[in-house]
């Protein structure tokens, strides 16, 4: 659909569609440790979904589309959460830096993301085009139903 951007579609449907696209393309470099890692220190278990790396990459690409100029540190803030400390009060805890770094490096390998000259990383024009194309497909599928 012409004129449809990432902002115009449901974020959950878009992230699922982009994750499926990344998995189907087979070009995203997935580390071998993805089945044994926790995503943050406040998490108790590893993710149940075996395709979580594709979902995280899709979510990160969407975040860079909307805001841009985000680095590893800001990604750890986004994917952080509440650390439960037993009888002591809960506090905010950041997400894994290694996971955030590897996701951004994998997206750089696809030429969807590049390092910004100021700080962090930003979406390339090719990456923005891919995300808009997938958003158009999601909107067309939604309109069909």
From Swiss-Prot:
One of its GO terms (biological process) is ribosomal small subunit assembly. Its main location: cytoplasm. Gene3D superfamilies: Winged helix-like DNA-binding domain superfamily/Winged helix DNA-binding domain. InterPro entries: Ribosomal_eS19, Ribosomal_eS19_CS, WH-like_DNA-bd_sf, WH_DNA-bd_sf. The modification N6-acetyllysine is found at residues 23, 111, 115. GO terms for molecular function: RNA binding; structural constituent of ribosome. It is found in: Cytoplasm; Nucleus, Nucleolus. Keywords: Acetylation, Cytoplasm, Host-virus interaction, Methylation, Nucleus, Ribonucleoprotein, Ribosomal protein. GO terms for cellular component: cytosolic ribosome; cytosolic small ribosomal subunit; nucleolus. The modification Omega-N-methylarginine is found at residue 67. The keyword Cytoplasm applies. SMART domains: Ribosomal_S19e. The modification N6-succinyllysine is found at residue 143. Component of the small ribosomal subunit. The ribosome is a large ribonucleoprotein complex responsible for the synthesis of proteins in the cell. Required for pre-rRNA processing and maturation of 40S ribosomal subunits. Part of the small subunit (SSU) processome, first precursor of the small eukaryotic ribosomal subunit. Component of the small ribosomal subunit. Part of the small subunit (SSU) processome, composed of more than 70 proteins and the RNA chaperone small nucleolar RNA (snoRNA) U3. Interacts with RPS19BP1; the interaction is direct and mediates the integration of RPS19 in state post-A1. Interacts with RPS19BP1. Belongs to the eukaryotic ribosomal protein eS19 family. This is Small ribosomal subunit protein eS19. The gene is RPS19.
